[in-house]
Each structure stands twice: as structure tokens, then as C-alpha cells.
Amino acid sequence: DASSFCQLPAVVGKCRGYFPRFYYNTEAGKCQQFIYGGCGGNRNNFETVEDCRATCHSH
């Protein structure tokens, strides 16, 4: 299921970069911003809130 990753938690990753990204927060029922370190993590990681909503908004 292509949208199952929308249920994954936000993961900063092991690198120390500072990249504002968006993830779908299942508890809040909406996309929220978090800081991504630049490597690792999971697919619940979008460059724009629009991409996040387009992929995960139906959950």
C-alpha cells in the first residue's frame, strides 16, 4: 500500500543537517513540519506540505 508509510513517525535521521520537512501526523490528522537531518528516516517525509497532503490526506 503506497500510503501505509503515512502512518510512520517523523524520523530526524542520523545526519546533522537542518532541512525543514513535513510528515503526516496520524494523531493530529494533518501534515506537520519537522526538521530532517538529511539522511536515514522513512518515506513519511515531504519537501512541501502540499506533497504531504496530496499523498496522505485521505487517512
Curated annotation (Swiss-Prot):
The keyword Glycoprotein does not apply. This is PI-actitoxin-Aeq3b. It comes from the Eukaryota. Dual-function toxin that inhibits both the serine protease trypsin and voltage-gated potassium channels (Kv). Disulfide bonds join 6-56, 15-39, 31-52. GO terms for cellular component: extracellular space; nematocyst. Keywords: Disulfide bond, Ion channel impairing toxin, Nematocyst, Potassium channel impairing toxin, Protease inhibitor, Secreted, Serine protease inhibitor, Toxin. InterPro entries: Kunitz_BPTI (IPR002223), Kunitz_BPTI_sf (IPR036880), Prtase_inh_Kunz-CS (IPR020901), TFPI/VKTCI-like (IPR050098). GO terms for molecular function: potassium channel regulator activity; serine-type endopeptidase inhibitor activity; toxin activity. Belongs to the venom Kunitz-type family. Sea anemone type 2 potassium channel toxin subfamily. PROSITE patterns: BPTI_KUNITZ_1 (PS00280), BPTI_KUNITZ_2 (PS50279). Residues 6-56 form the BPTI/Kunitz inhibitor domain. It is found in: Secreted; Nematocyst. It comes from Actinia equina (Beadlet anemone).
